[in-house]
């Protein structure tokens, strides 16, 4: 959910995410059989799946990271996240139950950003999973000291809330995991389905 000066900017986005090691799959929650994105961090590859057309488009991982780096560099500059010594972390009082797990809260504060994270330690996942994905996306360098503070925390974040002040306006983003299932994941979840036509992403609009 994204808001500006306390006013929601739309209904928010709900997603389903599968994770196993360095493999991820993302789908829209309202369309479980719809388009999906498969990220294979172990292979340095990504595919967009189009079930209607039975097409899997291979996304250039370097290009994807470059786009993320440009967006993250701007965001990092606005947040002041790369400035060493200007980011501090403090625990938040009390516990919060999220997706059935007791979570401890921490507040990371920078020059113009405040980030609250609520982390669960009973998932068998650590903060490195979250931080490694940020690094892979190319956002790690621009976040600098902010990411370094995140890496010091224990557990996996089930809720993150960031508040950034830009030109005297407060922009807030909240991400909450509402349901967690822990267990072995089918290999097929992270692979291109049989029968799909493989194409490579190009720079030309309307062409693959």
Show the residue positions of the predicted features.
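Extended soluble regions of mature proteins
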Residues: 1-208
């Amino acid at each position: 959910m994204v808001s500006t000066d306390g006013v929601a900017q739309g209904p928010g986005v709900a997603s389903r995410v599968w994770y196993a090691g360095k493999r991820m799959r993302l789908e829209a929650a309202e369309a479980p059989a719809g388009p999906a994105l498969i990220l294979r961090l172990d292979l340095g590859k990504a595919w967009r799946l189009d079930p209607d057309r039975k097409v899997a488009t291979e996304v250039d991982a370097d290009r994807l990271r470059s786009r993320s780096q440009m967006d993250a560099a701007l965001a990092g500059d606005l947040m002041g996240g790369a400035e060493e010594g200007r980011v501090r972390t403090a625990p938040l009082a009390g516990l919060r139950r999220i997706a059935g797990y007791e979570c401890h809260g921490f507040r990371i504060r920078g020059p113009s950003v405040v980030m609250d994270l609520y982390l669960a330690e009973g998932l068998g996942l650590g903060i490195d999973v979250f931080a490694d994905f940020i690094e892979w996306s190319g956002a790690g360098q621009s976040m600098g000291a902010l990411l370094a503070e995140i890496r010091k925390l224990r557990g996996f974040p089930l809720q993150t809330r960031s508040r950034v002040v830009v030109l005297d306006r407060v922009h807030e983003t909240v991400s909450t995991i509402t349901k967690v299932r822990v267990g072995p994941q089918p290999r097929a979840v992270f692979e291109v389905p049989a029968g799909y036509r493989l194409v490579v992403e190009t720079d030309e609009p309307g062409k693959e």
